[in-house]
Amino acid sequence: GIVDFAKGVLGKIKNVLGI
């Protein structure tokens, strides 16, 4: 769903930022 998609995007961003 939309929520799962948003969580996936946030996870990718966090990985890129090294958080």
Swiss-Prot record:
Q: List, alphabetically, the GO terms of the cellular component aspect.
A: extracellular region
Biological process according to GO: defense response to bacterium
Identify the keywords attached in UniProt to this record, alphabetized.
Amphibian defense peptide, Antibiotic, Antimicrobial, Secreted
Q: In which tissues is it expressed?
A: Expressed by the skin dorsal glands.
Q: Which domain of life is it from?
A: Eukaryota
Subcellular location per UniProt equals: Secreted
* Oxidoreductase recorded as keyword: no
Q: What does this protein do?
A: Shows a medium antibacterial activity against M.luteus, L.mesenteriodes and S.uberis.
**Name the UniProt record assigns to this protein:** Uperin-2.5
- The organism encoding this protein is Uperoleia inundata
